[in-house]
Structures are given as structure tokens and as C-alpha cells.
Amino acid sequence: MGEESKKTGEKRLLILQTLAAMLEEPSLEKITTAALAKRLAVSEAALYRHFASKAQMYEGLIEFIEATLLGLIAKLTTEKADPVQQVEGILSVLLSFARKNRGMTRVLIGEALINEDPRLQKRINQLHDRLEAQLRQCLRFMDGGHAGKDPKLLANLYMAWVVGRWHQFAKSGFERDPAADWNASWNELGLLLKS
């Protein structure tokens, strides 16, 4: 029974990887289960043996994004004690993830979720809120609290900048690198943290 469970897990993973690959294509056409099944050379019924719905497939992608990003951020905040370095690291992680996972970027900005189950967009919004909360937490621990600096406002500003970079990347057909000129960008963004 363990071998069958392993094969099922592998098939689920293959379906999710194929869906992510299809999302990397610049076409803005809605991905149907028929197109996904055709790409995998299986029947639609075979897809539904592994996922109850297409929404569940997207949930699988969102779970991967969430686990990856929050895991990387947890590791980073454990390794770096300086809150400014933590903020810089988090922003870099968010941009690098998009660069390496182009199809996932379309999920992160909600583009791939248009006309899908509304709970998927809600789930992505919750992830954005969690990422912003991570930034806010780092900003709260800055030395001296940086009088006059509002961690909530700064975290929102940084997150809006990241989401803007994700949008530019996706809307350019993945031509405009979200992490382009990162050092120069951080030099400017980091000024917001100076007293």
C-alpha cells in the first residue's frame, strides 16, 4: 500500500509541475483541465482521481508557494539578527522566488486565479498579509524603534513594491527581471529605515 501511495504522490506532483509550467507560458488564456490533461497525455478523469477540482490543484500550488516562502523567511530571520538585514533578505527572497518560479508569480499576483474559485484569491491575499506581517515584525525590532517610523506603514510600502515588481515581471511576459538592479534598489529602499 505504501508504494501505491508514493505513486499517487508522484502523480499529484507531476500534475502540479505541469500546471506551473503551463502558467509560465505568456498566453493569458485560461488553463482548462482539458488542456492540462492533454499536456499530461491523460484523461480529465485521471486528473480528478488525484484532485477533486481544478481549484484544489491551484490550492496545491499555493501551499507550495506558502511553504517555500515562509520556510525561507524563517531560516533567514533565524540566521540574521539585524532587522535591517532581515528586511533586505526577505525582499530579496520574494523577488528571487518569482524569478525562479515564473508560473507561480502569476498565482502570487492573482492573474492565474481570475475566473477560478474566489477562495483561491482570498488564500493568496492571506499569504500577502502573512508576508507583510513578517516584514512588520522585523521592523518592530529595529534599534531604538526608529522614532517616527511606522512599522505597519513601512511593511505595507515594501510589500506593495514587491507586488509591483511581480506584476511587471508577469506583464512583460517574464522579460523584466523582478530582481534587476537589486543592490541599487535596496540602497534607495533602505533609506526609508534611516533615522
Show which residues each predicted segment covers.
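Amphipathic alpha-helical packing segments from all-alpha helical-bundle domains
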Residues: 67-70, 74, 118-143, 152-156, ...
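Short, structured helix-loop boundary elements
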Residues: 5, 12-13, 33, 55, ...
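Amphipathic alpha-helical segments used for helix-helix packing
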Residues: 98-119, 171
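Amphipathic C-terminal alpha-helical segment
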Residues: 96-100, 137, 155-176, 188-195
